[in-house]
From Swiss-Prot:
The chain crosses the membrane at residues 83-103. Its main location: membrane. InterPro entries: PSI_PsaF, PSI_PsaF_sf. Belongs to the PsaF family. The keyword Membrane applies. This is Photosystem I reaction center subunit III. It is found in: Cellular thylakoid membrane. It comes from the Bacteria. It comes from Mastigocladus laminosus. The keyword rRNA-binding does not apply.
Length: 165
């Protein structure tokens, strides 16, 4: 039965009974040329106190690519001509998230070394300790590489507990 199914599948694929796959973005057009987008732009609501905010928003969106429904689409396939759509904001997000994590880790290590009232200092952050750490956090990628290469970033095998199952 499995061989029969495989034979039927091979025949269907051989004679192209499978639907053709469309290239990514093949049905996308510049929003400035999309009739559905133009209709949406005419009834754009203002989102701020600026009476022109809706119009300005749709002017910015008109540079993007729209689908047949008139909505802008992000192209996230790694092509550099669309880097401003997704690649640059995602790298910036990862940098900021890493900064926050690195600074939080450094703060916890610092208060743990001081030894007194650690749990309370986790809840109520002490600004004299936290501010210098926050300001030095911009260089977290270099500090992370340095700590990784020195072995300070990772735990030693002896420090990792093993479950006695």
């Amino acid at each position: 039965m499995q061989r029969l199914f495989a034979l039927i599948l091979a025949i269907f694929l051989w004679f192209h009974f499978a639907p053709p796959a469309q290239a990514l973005g093949a049905d996308l057009v510049p929003c400035s040329e999309s009739p559905a987008f133009q209709q949406r732009a005419q009834v754009a609501r203002n989102t701020t106190a600026d009476p022109e905010s809706g119009k300005k928003r749709f002017e910015r969106y008109s540079q993007a690519l729209c689908g047949p429904e008139g909505l802008p689409h992000l192209i996230v396939d790694g092509r550099l001509d669309h880097a401003g759509d997704f690649l640059i904001p995602s790298i910036l997000f990862l940098y900021i998230a890493g900064w926050i994590g690195w600074v939080g880790r450094a703060y916890l290590q610092t208060i743990k070394k001081q030894g007194s009232n650690v749990e309370q200092k986790e809840i109520q952050i002490e600004l004299p300790i936290a501010l210098p750490i926050m300001l030095s956090g911009f260089a977290w990628p270099a500090a992370a590489i340095k700590e990784f290469l020195s072995g300070e970033l990772t735990a030693k095998d002896e420090e990792i507990t093993i479950s006695p199952r």
